């Protein structure tokens, strides 16, 4: 099997595995996001094994799959304006999941590089969800007694950190 074919097959397998794991939700947040059974791990390992370029490509495809899952979960039922919806798709799905491909950034540095790259990629994903919470989803904080409208940054950090920090740890 040629190297390109092997990369393609491995990429398809890790996307499928990550998708299956993303459906195993340990904690599901009320307005999106969840703690899953290591769903980012296959993408991260692929990036570390095959490099950032290939990792970003596979992570981008995974982001499209996650967007599809978001549609199934009711993304279009949240009443977003067209502009907010486009921003949500870009920030919460395309960019947030594509950055997982950066896990292989320090792969040549051995185990410490793998850990640093993985944490960096997941923290960047957390940052994208945090940014989305501040810019797009701030009005949903009113469901918490107005907390978010007064403290949008803190609300977004707490909400998104509640599911992303466990994902970093596991």
Feature names for model-found ranges:
Residues 1-170:
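Loop-helix junctions at membrane interfaces
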């Amino acid at each position: 099997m040629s190297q390109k074919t092997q990369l393609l097959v491995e990429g398809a397998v890790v996307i499928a595995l990550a998708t299956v794991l993303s459906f195993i939700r340990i904690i599901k947040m009320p307005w999106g996001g969840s703690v899953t059974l290591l769903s980012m791990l296959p993408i991260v390992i692929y990036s570390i094994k095959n490099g950032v370029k290939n990792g970003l490509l596979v992570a981008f495809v995974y982001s499209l799959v996650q967007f599809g899952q978001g549609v199934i979960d009711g993304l279009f039922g949240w009443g977003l304006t067209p502009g907010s919806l486009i921003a949500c798709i870009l920030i919460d799905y395309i960019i947030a999941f594509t950055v997982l491909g950066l896990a292989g950034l320090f792969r040549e540095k051995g185990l410490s590089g793998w850990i640093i790259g993985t944490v960096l990629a997941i923290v960047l994903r957390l940052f994208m969800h945090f940014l989305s919470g501040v810019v797009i989803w701030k009005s949903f904080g009113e469901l918490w007694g107005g907390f978010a409208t007064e403290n949008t940054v803190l609300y977004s950090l707490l909400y998104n950190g509640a599911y992303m920090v466990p994902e970093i740890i596991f």
